[in-house]
Amino acid sequence: MSNNFKRTDRIAEMIQRKLALIIPQEIKDPRLKGFVTISAVKVAADLGHAKIYFTVLNEDKSVVTNILNGAASYLRSALARSITLRTVPQLHFIYDESIEYGQRLSRLIDEVNPPDSSSDDNN
């Protein structure tokens, strides 16, 4: 069997696509004003649990994490209606800090190597 992707990877990708559609449509919490983006999904080998990594713009990440984890059982049932799996994994939402980390590194690089404006003045 020479599949390029494992079954868990295919399921994770499907869950990511479906949740990206379900969350904006189904979550009506007034505290959730920002735009939630699902950045990655990691599914356990036994398909019992799924870690959902997300980012959010202009919102408190701990509040959004609590909202999403509070709605996890509802999102799981909405997900079960839209996909065909024997069992839908339990969802655990985790804030993805990789984007903030990348922005922080970019700022540090810009501080160390500022744009050379003096060469523009000499030309």
From Swiss-Prot:
The keyword Transit peptide does not apply. GO terms for cellular component: cytosol. GO terms for biological process: maturation of SSU-rRNA. Pfam families: RBFA (PF02033). PROSITE patterns: RBFA. The keyword Phosphoprotein does not apply. Keywords: Cytoplasm, Ribosome biogenesis. It is found in: Cytoplasm. GO terms for molecular function: ribosomal small subunit binding. Signal peptide: none annotated. Monomer. Binds 30S ribosomal subunits, but not 50S ribosomal subunits or 70S ribosomes. HAMAP family: RbfA (MF_00003). Belongs to the RbfA family. One of several proteins that assist in the late maturation steps of the functional core of the 30S ribosomal subunit. Associates with free 30S ribosomal subunits (but not with 30S subunits that are part of 70S ribosomes or polysomes). Required for efficient processing of 16S rRNA. May interact with the 5'-terminal helix region of 16S rRNA. This is Ribosome-binding factor A. The gene is rbfA.
